[in-house]
Amino acid sequence: EAYDMVYNGFEFSEKTGEPILMRMVTRLAHSRSGVERKEQKPQNSISFSEDPRQFILLPGNARKRYKVLLARQDEFIKASEESPYNKYIDGPNKKLGIVACGIGYNYLMENYPEGCEYPVLKIGQYPLPKKQLLQLVESCDEILVLEDGQPFVEKHLKGYLGIGIKVKGRLD
């Protein structure tokens, strides 16, 4: 899946004109898997950017660029909500909702080979998908965040939700 994410990430970058980042966490960096190679794409033609300052993020450029990115945030959230890498999987037990990020999702599913009894939101693309997050939060009593490395998503959720729902994770 990580291979496909990079492949599709480059397409997304070309479409939006924005760079993409592949967040390599420890567990992913130390794992191996067979991949099915995709068809190689033809080389892009080389051309100069209309605004090369978008790639030179000195403080003066970064402040202006930040405004542009904020204006496009809804577009990025919509792409995240429609991404095949973010998906909501319903479960019968609504006492707990699980947000599983990246390889944390694989570890969760290894422990539930017959399917997880709790609703799970698999996160593989950012920004966080609002629609799926609200679906999980509105149907569950509390949220558990599974992520590798720093508690990035957990911090985001605690600030983003702000509605009194309990969020558990590394910060507990």
Write out the residue ranges for each language-model feature.
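Flexible, low-complexity linker and terminal segments
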Residues: 2-172
